[in-house]
Regions:
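N-terminal secretory signal peptides
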Residues: 1-19
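Residue-level marker of regulatory loop/turn positions in helix-turn-helix DNA-binding domains and
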Residues: 13, 44, 95
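N-terminal export leaders
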Residues: 16-33
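A cross-family signal for key residues in well-ordered alpha-helices
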Residues: 22, 53, 104
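Zn2+-dependent cytidine deaminase-like catalytic core
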Residues: 82-158
């Protein structure tokens, strides 16, 4: 469900706002920014299937517990080192997204907050908070969705 707009708020698609932003930052800067946030759109190969299935299992676990339907796993050197269902509702923690839970689990199991060389698999494209957490943890790449869309390397964005 879309959130109602605040009184006087300018919709993001407003042509006047777009024109203003173009004048302010220049068309080239806007085109560059748009290309920087567009991830590669290709599906993962068959070698990723077991991890996509494991993320779906985490999603099913979240739903069975009465939580939001999201799941994620962290993989290093071909083995799962962390997993997590969404616990936002059950833990009453707005930061307990599946990706964050999987990153926390992997860090605990590996004994390090540095997850360099790890891959994150998620049932949906991670939100900005989760992608930023993956970035700061050093996650190498992430895949999302039922067919494992290649989301590229995690990056910071606004």
């Amino acid at each position: 469900m879309a959130e109602p707009e605040a009184a006087g708020a300018v919709p993001a698609t407003d042509p006047e706002r777009r024109a203003f932003m173009t004048r302010l930052f220049g068309a080239g800067a806007l085109a560059l920014a748009a290309s920087a946030v567009a991830p590669p759109a290709r599906a993962a190969g068959p070698e990723h299937a077991p991890f996509i299935v494991r993320a779906q299992d985490m999603r099913a676990r979240a739903l069975a517990a009465g939580d939001q339907g999201f799941g994620a796993v962290v993989v290093k050197d071909g083995r799962v080192v962390g997993d997590g269902p969404s616990r936002v509702v059950t833990a009453t923690d707005p930061t307990a997204h599946a990706e964050i839970e999987a990153i926390r689990d992997a860090a605990r199991k590996l004994g390090s907050s540095n997850l360099a060389g790890c891959i994150l698999y998620s049932t949906f494209r991670p939100c900005r908070m989760c992608e930023a957490a993956a970035y700061w943890a050093g996650v190498q790449r992430f895949y999302h969705g039922a067919d494992g869309q290649d989301g590229g390397a995690p990056r910071l964005g606004c």
